């Protein structure tokens, strides 16, 4: 029928769950500011009060909700498209993942997400990215050690963020680089640290830094190496 939306509110509401997002390869982005960052038109937009009551992922809807196709790339595509990558290993908080994506966008990097990390398309991840999900290449569901082997073979330096390491962010090399960051508390497993050539710590008065803060510091340091 003419005028029938391509994606109904009922179908869109199912995209709040990972199961249905994966089945449809679609996700939700919410709010005018985030939708305004999208370089592609959404497949469907919901804006009426009744539609938002069904589709919004928030108790108090913050604006229109758009439906978009998945954006992630393969590991090979990621490594071919950027010179700096942050690998998030086992970072399960979607807010941290989204904020790290935002930092990667700011500093011209890409993001690699290991298996067990927060879902790239979780509404909280999308929201925390503040639209950077549309501008940042992200590969997901990766085996970290396998990804590092591929990155090393492609000429990337491999750095592990380890709290007790003697190296500091200022010692990061220039050139192509993968920075590996684990979850706050558990950190990186030994096999990931062993796969890296460099270990760097971040001097701090706090016992630990969350993953997104660590990512921001290290990505800035790597970015500053290529500034004129």
Q: Model-flagged regions — what are they?
A:
Residues 26-34, 42-47, 138-140, 154-159, ...:
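Short, hydrophobic beta-strand segments that form beta-sheet elements in well-ordered domains
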Residues 31, 92-100, 208-214:
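Amphipathic alpha-helical repeat scaffolds
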Residues 72-73, 77-161:
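RNA substrate-binding interface of SAM-dependent RNA methyltransferases
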Residues 47-75:
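Glycine/small-residue-rich loop that forms an oxyanion/phosphate-binding "nest" at active or ligand-binding sites
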Residues 156-206, 211:
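Active-site/ligand-binding-proximal alpha/beta "capping" segment
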């Amino acid at each position: 029928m003419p005028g029938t939306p391509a994606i109904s509110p009922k179908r869109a509401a199912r995209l709040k769950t990972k199961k249905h997002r994966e089945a449809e390869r679609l996700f939700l982005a919410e709010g005018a500011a985030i939708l305004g960052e999208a370089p592609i038109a959404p497949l469907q937009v919901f804006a009426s009060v009744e539609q938002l009551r069904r589709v919004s992922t928030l108790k108090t809807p913050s604006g229109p909700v758009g439906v978009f196709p998945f954006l992630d790339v393969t590991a090979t595509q990621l490594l071919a498209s950027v010179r700096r990558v942050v690998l998030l290993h086992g970072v399960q908080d979607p807010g941290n993942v989204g904020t790290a994506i935002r930092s990667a966008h700011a500093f011209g990097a890409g993001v690699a997400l290991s298996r067990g990390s927060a879902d790239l398309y979780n509404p909280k991840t999308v929201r925390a990215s503040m639209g950077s999900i549309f501008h940042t290449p992200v590969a997901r569901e990766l085996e970290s050690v396998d990804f590092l082997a591929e990155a090393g073979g492609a000429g990337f330096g491999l750095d592990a963020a380890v709290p007790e390491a003697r190296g500091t962010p200022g010692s990061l090399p220039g050139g192509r680089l993968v920075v590996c960051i684990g979850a706050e508390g558990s950190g990186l497993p030994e096999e990931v640290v062993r796969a890296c050539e460099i270990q760097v710590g971040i001097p701090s008065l706090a016992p630990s830094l969350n993953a997104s803060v660590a990512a921001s510091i290290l990505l800035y340091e790597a970015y500053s190496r290529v500034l004129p």
